[in-house]
Curated annotation (Swiss-Prot):
Coiled coil: none annotated. Reduced FMN (FMNH(2)). It catalyses: 5-O-(1-carboxyvinyl)-3-phosphoshikimate = chorismate + phosphate. GO terms for molecular function: chorismate synthase activity; FMN binding. One of its GO terms (biological process) is aromatic amino acid family biosynthetic process. This is Chorismate synthase. InterPro entries: Chorismate_synth (IPR000453), Chorismate_synth_AroC_sf (IPR035904), Chorismate_synthase_CS (IPR020541). It comes from Beijerinckia indica subsp. indica (strain ATCC 9039 / DSM 1715 / NCIMB 8712). HAMAP family: Chorismate_synth. NCBIfam families: aroC, PRK05382.1. PANTHER family: CHORISMATE SYNTHASE.
Amino acid sequence: MSHNTFGHLFRVTTFGESHGPAIGCVVDGCPPLIPIDEADIQTFLDLRRPGTSRFTTQRQEADRVRILSGVFTDEASGKQVSTGTPIALLIENTDQRSKDYDAIKNLYRPGHADFAYDAKYGLRDHRGGGRSSARETATRVAAGAIARKVVADVTIRGALVQMGPHKINRDAWDWDETTRNPFFCPDAKAAAFFETYLDDIRKAGSSIGAVIEIVAENVPAGWGAPLYGKLDADLASGLMSINAVKGVEIGEGFDAAALSGEANADEMRIGSLGEPVFLSNHAGGILGGISTGQPLVMRFAVKPTSSILQPRHTIDRSGHESEIVTKGRHDPCVGIRAVPVGEAMVACVLADHFLRHRGQIGEGAVWPANRSR
């Protein structure tokens, strides 16, 4: 299996399966002398960790990360810092229940990657989906914690803004609220509704989808490159690579198709300090594949968890029709834990584009340098 690596200068390779002994990643391209310790990474892993509420899978994984390489204690500061060499991170699996999947070993689970993997490789790991499991995303969160250090001036935050057909009230948006409820929801009233709503879905043995919004602030103008290195293209690719994601939009996204040209274009003025000021942000902070200095705004849609307790029609590996009920421990709304995963992927893409921009352009801002020409 190829394509287990993403990024150009900041490169992440992940490895491991859902029911294997461990999962992990190797981060290559991290600059030297960046303070990194396991506690920094663990903070973000704990946000994604399973079994933290009744609304996520009850698989109990501590997700304790170990740094195996790429760091050294700096004698001058006494801190553990990156050396510039590959950083290997390992997370052990401790709560696998492979026997839960014995009954469906030869059955394809509808909505899962079972059939597609078998069609391509001639085999599949039926134990929790193996490599196709969302368990792999813990390694992305670990890599994202390092990426955040590379772009330390950038603030990256995510929120669940829709569950099923129910959207939050954007006028009630409060980022602090995302830390007060199990849904990473910025609307307190919506979070209270989601609690009852998802309880009913969970008790019925079903699942539901969600929409996640990620906002990255303090990204300077100039990151990204035309035509085939566009920042929004790489962000979309990173977010689409997350398990169960079926759609990504930047800024107004698909709603832009319903707007007129004058409504969609972000008009500009000169601010009090001579800086460019945008009067709106329909573009989501990216024009021509290059950041504008405005907040980057993106959303991705997560489909309902395919593993449910409702019986469904399927076929087996021998070509016989059958019925399947997927047992085991699964998220009733996988979109909840996709929030820190989405943040991590955005962080990795931004770290990569920061290094690519610095390598081509240098540290200086381009726009002010061009004003006198």
